[in-house]
């Protein structure tokens, strides 16, 4: 599933193409995604100029004068920028095209768990949309601190890794990035969230930011389907300290990496480096 780094890589790849350009038309070939594509979306966007592309959590917010169209990549979704001249014929899983003058923005989603939605400007701030309003803070914002994590986890018995994944404290820390961040912070993923001290949460906040920044720099992680807007795979997964390295020696101390299951998801950690 594309997480924050993959969505941010997509945003950075798309925005230089679409910002300041007008949508000539929208071709919706499959309206039944995770939620139905709004029936009037194509007409609503015709001849509209894209003003900006923002990311909130794992959602992409494309602003036009009348509102925002919101895209979520789901588990297998991608957005590709394709030259209008000689654009490939849409394949089975190519569900939506936004046609501009010189290129096509194509949404592909084999499993159809993604979404394309509309938020009209008269409905108010897009960040108040029901899917966005309850999201945690952005990891690169000043609001994301060790003190925030410490305060929000007092009395909680859930594991620190599961608390990170929940998304109500901080957005975008998916499974691979939670394991990697906890390794960098030296925190064992099974530790109860409420038992982690403030200094250790301060290290964890720094580790989350560093891990996500490194992943973005490397084009995200391609475990199955993800490619960026230019069709290239990410390669962060090649440099992981612990993720998907069960039985291999820790890159720091040489201890074999362990794999366990938490909340039906695989967790990887070093039993020596993480306490």
From Swiss-Prot:
Keywords, comma-separated and alphabetical: DNA damage, DNA repair, DNA-binding, Glycosidase, Hydrolase, Lyase, Metal-binding, Multifunctional enzyme, Zinc, Zinc-finger
Keyword Protein transport: no
GO molecular function terms noted in the UniProt entry: 8-oxo-7,8-dihydroguanine DNA N-glycosylase activity; class I DNA-(apurinic or apyrimidinic site) endonuclease activity; damaged DNA binding; zinc ion binding
FPG-type zinc finger segments: 241-275
Matching SMART domains: Fapy_DNA_glyco, H2TH
EC nos: 3.2.2.23, 4.2.99.18
Domain of life: Bacteria
Residues that hold DNA according to the record: 93, 111, 156
GO biological process: base-excision repair
Catalytically driven reaction(s): Hydrolysis of DNA containing ring-opened 7-methylguanine residues, releasing 2,6-diamino-4-hydroxy-5-(N-methyl)formamidopyrimidine; 2'-deoxyribonucleotide-(2'-deoxyribose 5'-phosphate)-2'-deoxyribonucleotide-DNA = a 3'-end 2'-deoxyribonucleotide-(2,3-dehydro-2,3-deoxyribose 5'-phosphate)-DNA + a 5'-end 5'-phospho-2'-deoxyribonucleoside-DNA + H(+)
Coiled coil: none
Catalytic residues (UniProt): 2-3, 58, 265
Cofactor binding description: Binds 1 zinc ion per subunit.
InterPro entries xref list: DNA_glyclase/AP_lyase_DNA-bd, DNA_glyclase_Znf_dom_DNA_BS, Formamido-pyr_DNA_Glyclase, FPG_cat, MutM-like_N-ter, Ribosomal_uS13-like_H2TH, Znf_DNA_glyclase/AP_lyase, Znf_FPG/IleRS
Needed cofactors: Zn(2+)
Family to which the UniProt record says this protein belongs: Belongs to the FPG family.
Subunit structure: Monomer.
Function: Involved in base excision repair of DNA damaged by oxidation or by mutagenic agents. Acts as a DNA glycosylase that recognizes and removes damaged bases. Has a preference for oxidized purines, such as 7,8-dihydro-8-oxoguanine (8-oxoG). Has AP (apurinic/apyrimidinic) lyase activity and introduces nicks in the DNA strand. Cleaves the DNA backbone by beta-delta elimination to generate a single-strand break at the site of the removed base with both 3'- and 5'-phosphates.
NCBIfam families: fpg, PRK01103.1
Protein name (database record): Formamidopyrimidine-DNA glycosylase
Gene name of this polypeptide: mutM
């Amino acid at each position: 599933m594309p997480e924050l780094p993959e969505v941010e890589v997509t945003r950075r790849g798309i925005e230089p193409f679409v910002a300041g350009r007008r949508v000539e038309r929208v071709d919706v070939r499959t309206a039944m995604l995770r939620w139905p594509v709004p029936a009037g979306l194509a007409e609503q966007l015709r001849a509209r100029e894209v003003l900006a592309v923002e990311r909130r959590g794992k959602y992409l917010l494309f602003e036009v004068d009348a509102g925002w169209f919101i895209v979520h990549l789901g588990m297998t979704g991608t957005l590709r920028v394709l030259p209008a001249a000689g654009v490939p014929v849409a394949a089975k899983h190519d569900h939506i095209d936004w046609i501009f003058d010189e290129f096509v923005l194509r949404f592909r989603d084999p499993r159809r768990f993604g979404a394309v939605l509309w938020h009209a400007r008269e409905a108010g701030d897009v960040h108040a949309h029901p899917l966005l309003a309850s999201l945690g803070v952005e990891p690169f914002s000043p609001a994301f601190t060790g003190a925030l994590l410490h305060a929000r986890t007092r009395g909680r018995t859930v594991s620190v890794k599961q608390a990170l994944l929940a998304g109500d404290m901080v957005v975008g820390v998916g499974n691979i990035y939670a394991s990697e961040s906890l390794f960098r912070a030296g925190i064992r993923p099974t530790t109860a969230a409420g038992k982690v001290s403030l200094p250790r949460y301060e290290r964890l906040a720094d580790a989350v930011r560093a891990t996500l920044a490194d992943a973005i720099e490397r084009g995200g992680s391609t475990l199955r389907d993800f490619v960026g807007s230019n069709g290239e795979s990410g390669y962060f997964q090649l440099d992981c300290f612990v993720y998907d390295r069960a039985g291999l020696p820790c890159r720091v101390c040489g201890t074999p990496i362990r794999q366990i299951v938490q909340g039906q998801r695989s967790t990887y950690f070093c039993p020596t480096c993480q306490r």
